[in-house]
Amino acid sequence: MMRRATPEDRDLLVAWDADPDVRAAGGDDDWWDWDRALAEDVDHEEFWLAVEDDGPSGIIVLLDAAREPTHYWGDVEPGTWALDIWIGRPDRRGRGLGTAMLRWAIDRCFTVHDAHRILIDPLETNVRAIELYRRVGFVDVGPRTFGDDRCLVLELSRPDPPRCAPSG
């Protein structure tokens, strides 16, 4: 189940961010100001927790990359969304939760936000994440440096709607 993250989740998210594996996968520049992020109610970013029977296990962030105020992604077309995802609980990594969260977020971007393109930027060294993103359909855009982090930008384009054959 997915639910919106709230200010009450701040301490949990800070603890997840301190995990050495999460830090290694996230890079030096990829940390959220949870006090600000969870207190603001803006329509260009969403924070969702994956919640299992025994509590939250991971978080996924959905960003309208064209409207996001820091312009992290540079100048992108309207309808471009970006994702950031991590599994906070070590016992949940490598068990399919990230795939399920990613598929949920892709569906939300395309159906709720009418996105035409989704971007994601794992570190070039995060081979497992890159393989996952490719497996669900993302394609390489190319390497890019964000701050001190060497990333591989990948994108997923919205599938074209089916076309009806002309009658006659």
Regions found by a protein language model. Name each.
Residues 1-39, 160-168:
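A short, well-structured alpha-helix characteristic of acyl/acetyltransferase catalytic modules
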Residues 5, 87-88, 122:
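Hydrophobic adenine-recognition pocket in adenosine-nucleotide-binding enzymes
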Residues 28, 33-92, 108, 158-159:
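Acetyl-CoA-dependent GNAT
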Residues 77-80, 116-119, 123-127, 143-168:
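C-terminal "cap" of GNAT-fold acetyltransferases
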Residues 94-108, 131-135:
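Conserved acetyl-CoA-binding loop-helix of GNAT-fold acetyltransferases
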Residues 109-113:
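Hydrophobic pocket-lining residues that define ligand/cofactor binding sites across diverse proteins
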Residues 134-143:
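Conserved acetyl-CoA-binding loop of GNAT-fold acetyltransferases
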